[in-house]
Design a protein with these regions (language model features):
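Short beta-strand scaffold segments in enzyme catalytic cores
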Residues: 33-36, 73, 159, 219-220, ...
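Residue-level signal for inorganic ion chemistry
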Residues: 66, 95, 160, 227, ...
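Conserved catalytic-core subdomain
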Residues: 1-18, 27, 166, 170, ...
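Flexible, glycine/charged-enriched surface loops at secondary-structure junctions
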Residues: 109-110, 126-134, 219-222, 272-282
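N-terminal accessory segments that position/regulate proteins before the catalytic core
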Residues: 1-93, 98, 176, 295-335
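Glycine-rich, charged/polar anion/phosphate-binding loops
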Residues: 17-21, 47-49, 56, 142-147, ...
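Extended Lys/Arg-rich, glycine-bearing segments that form polyanion-binding/interaction patches
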Residues: 18-21, 88-214, 298-317, 325
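Long, well-ordered mid-to-C-terminal structural blocks that present hydrophobic/aromatic surfaces
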Residues: 211-230, 235
Length: 335
């Protein structure tokens, strides 16, 4: 168990007055969680301190070789003023998988959750009250060695920051236009597609800009080998319902294992849907649409944003679990 030292700010920021204009990740709370790693000592000096910049040497490893990982999750305020987290252990375990791939020391699941809960408790007044808004939580780890040699760092910083946020897209949970990218790729077998690391996202910016220029909100990525099988959208997983079956790409190294994706699959199976995790060619999807086959799709944003589908029960139920709108037997919420 972490011994977290808390130093509260003496200059609190003004909180947003109009929650309908929050945007995403634009304004940050008063505090942040920080913990250091030193080879031979492990993770140490867990603390919550006033939000402030880091002072880093220009030769810090992360600037040059991108040895860093991150997560994304949310805290929700319920009708009875309780603050809830949605399946934080899934984010903690996924960060461990990312850490293993990037040669970063793992953070124990219980320590990750304790750190998140402690920071959210300090910042509970920043959790929005309105529907569709939440406190976005961004845990991240970066290499902190100084030097230009290419090797795993011996020092790291684990930090968590928070931002009261609205919908990721301006469209909210209304349908968005998605561009199918058949030139650039997001991931390939053996690389880091299943992790949350900055390099994956930096490499996606070019295609995202080209899509935006043509009026699209996001990019649908195809596989990196044959460029014909659907994998995921830039900020979300995606599913297709065709003739009663639900299809989605398997998370076998090139697709990020989304928490909302996992939750919807579990619910769909409980409700009797056949869920197929495997290869689905974009040509087959387009042909099904042309043939008038019974088909719909849902984009599963990790924060539960997405497009409506003809099996709305799954998406809405997951979102309702997050907001505690409906009772559930699922142990997915952490007060």
């Amino acid at each position: 168990m972490l011994d977290i030292k808390i130093t509260r700010t003496t200059c609190p920021k003004e909180k947003p007055q109009d929650e309908s204009k929050l945007g995403f990740g634009k304004k940050f709370t008063d505090h942040m969680f920080v913990m250091d790693y030193t080879e031979g000592e492990g993770w140490h000096d867990a603390r919550i301190v006033p939000y402030a910049p880091f002072q880093l040497d220009p030769a810090t490893v992360v600037f040059h070789y991108a040895q860093e990982i991150f997560e994304g999750m949310k805290a929700y305020r319920t009708a009875d003023d309780t603050i809830q987290l949605f399946r934080p252990e899934c984010n903690a375990k996924r960060m461990q998988d990312s850490a293993d791939r990037l040669c970063i020391p793992k953070i124990p699941v219980e320590d990750y959750i304790q750190a998140v809960e402690a920071l959210v408790d300090v910042e509970r007044d920043w959790v929005p009250h309105s529907d569709g808004a939440s406190l976005y939580i961004r845990p991240f780890v970066f290499a902190n060695d100084v030097g230009l040699g290419v090797h795993a760092s011996k020092h790291y910083i684990f930090c968590i920051i928070c931002a009261p946020s609205g919908a990721y897209y301006a469209e909210g949970i209304n349908p968005v236009r998605i561009y199918v990218e058949d030139e650039y790729i997001r991931a390939a077998p053996g690389l880091t597609g299943f992790t949350k690391c900055g390099g994956n996202y930096a490499a996606s910016i070019k295609a995202g800009e080209l899509a935006e220029e043509q009026g699209y909100a996001q990019v649908l990525w195809l596989d990196g080998v044959e460029k014909k099988y659907v994998e995921e959208v830039g900020s979300m997983n995606i599913m297709f319902k065709i003739d009663g079956k639900v299809y989605t790409a398997a998370t076998v190294g090139t697709v990020l294992p989304g928490v909302t994706r996992r939750s919807c699959i579990e619910l769909l199976k409980d409700w009797g849907y056949e869920v197929v995790e495997g290869k689905l060619a974009i040509a087959d999807i387009m042909q099904a649409a042309r043939d008038g086959t019974s088909m719909s799709l849902v984009s599963l944003f990790i924060t539960a944003n997405g497009t409506p589908m003809t099996f709305p029960k799954s998406f809405k139920q997951v979102f309702n679990f997050m907001r505690v709108y409906v009772p559930t037997e699922q142990t997915w919420l952490t007060p």
